[in-house]
Amino acid sequence: MKLKNTLGLAIGTIVAATSFGALAQGQGAVEIEGFAKKEMYDSARDFKNNGNLFGGSIGYFLTDDVELRLGYDEVHNVRSDDGKNIKGADTALDALYHFNNPGDMLRPYVSAGFSDQSIGQNGRNGRNGSTFANIGGGPKLYFTDNFYARAGVEAQYNIDQGDTEWAPSVGIGVNFGGGSKKVEAAPAPVAEVCSDSDNDGVCDNVDKCPDTPANVTVDADGCPAVAEVVRVELDVKFDFDKSVVKPNSYGDIKNLADFMQQYPQTTTTVEGHTDSVGPDAYNQKLSERRANAVKQVLVNQYGVGASRVNSVGYGESKPVADNATEAGRAVNRRVEAEVEAQAK
């Protein structure tokens, strides 16, 4: 009677849960299963044949993968060596770990737990009890999101007798009440089609310049974009009668080089200057050496292409400060350069 009630409860739950469609896998799900098991008894037991077990289980998913399961089954068709019928029951508590994800068709599992077996001969008072430590595993195959079939095998170690028995099993079951499910990918949004008479990429209903010529870059309003001009200037100072670039000027030269690398279409002219001390011809040559020294730093130190850098000397012809004072002459001993480009 117990067995009939157990199987009836399992089958009834499967039918009811499937009918209402309130099934789900994953964390929080409840699992109901009916199963059949073949018990391969150890030779140390005084049994003539192996046993058939039928039962059911109920499980609860603590996470999407970890399930705690309570099972009950009854022993049938077992005879002792003297031909007597053997009857008994098993109660088991196992933890299962499932692989793959909730909603996948195949979810293999491994299990571990303990069971208590009470078994004895018909017509005799008293039964023998044994405690088992169990490990097992197998696959669950889902026919729908929640209705599945299972096959597995357990190794059952009899703690009381020190023997190991094997128990293959099959079952069918359902999961319901969980919260995790395969998330279907959202359909790609359909791009809105709008009229664009001048083909500038801006819809006519917001285009403030509807007749823009072809191949003209436009802003968000559909009007020709105004290019922003960006500029970098260089001003390198030199000691009297020297054309050696001082270490404290390398940072400014690098800034110019970085700008030219960012805008590879740019070129620059490096202009050398001197103060008024000395002959004009000497100062002209000195200014050219200064300009060339800065060019070499740009090219050799910072990798600017030589074809993009011109150098020219102006001698003392373009002062920016008073050459009558030492401070003014220090300002005039310089190299200047300027680069400008349209902002990206």
UniProtKB/Swiss-Prot annotation:
It comes from the Bacteria. The keyword Cytoplasm does not apply. Contains two disulfide bonds. It is a multi-pass membrane protein. Has porin activity, forming small water-filled channels. Also has a structural role in determining cell shape and ability to grow in low-osmolarity medium. Residues 1-24 form the signal peptide. It comes from Pseudomonas syringae pv. syringae. One of its GO terms (molecular function) is calcium ion binding. Gene3D superfamilies: 2.40.160.20, OmpA-like domain (3.30.1330.60). Keywords: Cell outer membrane, Cell shape, Disulfide bond, Ion transport, Membrane, Porin, Signal, Transmembrane, Transmembrane beta strand, Transport. Residues 225-343 form the OmpA-like domain. It is found in: Cell outer membrane. Belongs to the outer membrane OOP (TC 1.B.6) superfamily. Its main location: membrane. The lineage of its organism: Bacteria, Pseudomonadati, Pseudomonadota, Gammaproteobacteria, Pseudomonadales. GO terms for cellular component: cell outer membrane; pore complex. This is Outer membrane porin F.
